[in-house]
């Protein structure tokens, strides 16, 4: 198997803005790489063939800041080469009893008793899970799994490549769904479920923050989406959490968290709210008071 790499050099000053764009547009096949020593940055994507690579580059270009619209370079990479390129910067990481491990370590990685691994393959547009927005969510999720056990519905709203929903299943939650308004994201999520032998255990479907949350009463609802989208759909997100349930919001720049907190405080004034910050990003955890389920 071979892949086509697309590489665009971007100004290092634009790296954070481009990374935010990738998250907002859910462009899982692309990543931003920075060399802070030399002050250079690149936007890199991997695609199955030249046609897909050129189409993706053409679609992305008008979305980029003008300063980041350099001409892309294309090169075909053998399977061994593109896997090795990821091995240099992608290493296992862990929080609590869940480990996120590159699939090429599947035969050698040693898990402690009672721990679980989610196998990641960046070549499948899975990403590494290492971005602060994802890590904030999964750290909350691990803690909630210890608190709630396996009871209740877990929903990953805007699932992207499925890492949060699949992490929930690995932690033992039995009723897990994920949705995205991008058909390609749903397809990738389903592929990643197969990679982790979770196909049939997690249901993925195409939906948005209105249709995907219709009639939902989640024990845990996760939305790793940018701040403006969270604010716009605050009422839908709040209404989809059952009494005693938890809403986890991420994808929020630290400079925007007060604005998001205020918006959700208006929608859910009696909910307990707390926040954590990691790097330039913050999350919010909102807990709905236990009470009678609204019909």
From Swiss-Prot:
Q: Which Pfam families does this entry report, sorted A to Z?
A: PrmA (PF06325)
Location(s) in or outside the cell: Cytoplasm
Cite a GO CC annotation.
cytoplasm
Gene3D superfamilies from the UniProt entry: Vaccinia Virus protein VP39
* Coarse class of the protein's main subcellular location: cytoplasm
Arranged from A to Z, the UniProt key words for this protein are: Cytoplasm, Methyltransferase, S-adenosyl-L-methionine, Transferase
List the GO molecular function terms. Answer: protein-lysine N-methyltransferase activity
Q: Which InterPro entries match?
A: Ribosomal_L11_MeTrfase_PrmA, Ribosomal_PrmA_MeTrfase, SAM-dependent_MTases_sf
**Domain of life of the native organism:** Bacteria
Q: Which GO terms describe its biological process?
A: methylation
Q: Which reaction does it catalyse?
A: L-lysyl-[protein] + 3 S-adenosyl-L-methionine = N(6),N(6),N(6)-trimethyl-L-lysyl-[protein] + 3 S-adenosyl-L-homocysteine + 3 H(+)
Give the EC number(s) under which this enzyme is classified: 2.1.1.-
Q: Where does S-adenosyl-L-methionine bind?
A: 134, 158, 180, 224
Leading EC class: transferase
**What does the function comment of this entry state?**
Methylates ribosomal protein L11.
Family note: Belongs to the methyltransferase superfamily. PrmA family.
Alphabetical list of HAMAP family matching this protein: Methyltr_PrmA
Q: Specify the protein name.
A: Ribosomal protein L11 methyltransferase
The root-end lineage is: Bacteria, Pseudomonadati, Verrucomicrobiota, Opitutia, Opitutales
């Amino acid at each position: 198997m071979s892949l086509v790499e697309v590489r665009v050099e971007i100004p290092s000053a634009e790296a954070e803005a481009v990374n935010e764009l990738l998250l907002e547009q859910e462009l899982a096949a692309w990543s931003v790489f920075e060399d802070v020593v030399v002050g250079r940055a690149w936007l890199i994507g991997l695609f199955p063939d030249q046609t897909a690579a050129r189409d993706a580059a053409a679609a992305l270009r008008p979305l980029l800041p003008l300063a980041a619209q350099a001409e892309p370079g294309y090169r075909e990479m053998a399977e061994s080469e593109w896997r090795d390129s990821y091995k240099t910067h992608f290493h296992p990481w862990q929080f609590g009893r869940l480990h996120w491990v590159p699939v090429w370590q599947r035969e050698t990685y040693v898990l402690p008793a009672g721990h679980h691994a989610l196998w990641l393959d960046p070549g499948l547009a899975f990403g590494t899970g290492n971005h602060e927005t994802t890590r904030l969510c999964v750290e909350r999720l691990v803690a909630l799994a210890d608190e709630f056990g396996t009871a209740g519905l877990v929903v990953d709203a805007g699932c992207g490549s499925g890492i949060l929903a699949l992490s929930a299943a690995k932690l033992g939650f039995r009723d897990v769904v994920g949705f995205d308004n991008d058909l390609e994201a749903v397809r990738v999520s389903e592929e990643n479920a197969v990679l982790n032998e979770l196909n049939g255990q997690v249901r993925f479907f195409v939906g948005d923050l209105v249709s995907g949350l219709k009639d939902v009463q989640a024990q845990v609802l996760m939305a790793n989406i940018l701040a403006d989208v969270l604010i716009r759909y605050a009422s839908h997100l709040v209404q989809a959490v059952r009494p005693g349930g938890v809403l986890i919001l991420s994808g929020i720049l630290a400079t925007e968290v007060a604005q998001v907190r205020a918006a959700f405080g208006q929608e859910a004034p009696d909910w307990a709210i707390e926040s954590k910050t990691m790097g330039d990003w913050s999350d919010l955890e909102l807990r709905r008071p236990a009470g009678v389920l609204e019909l």
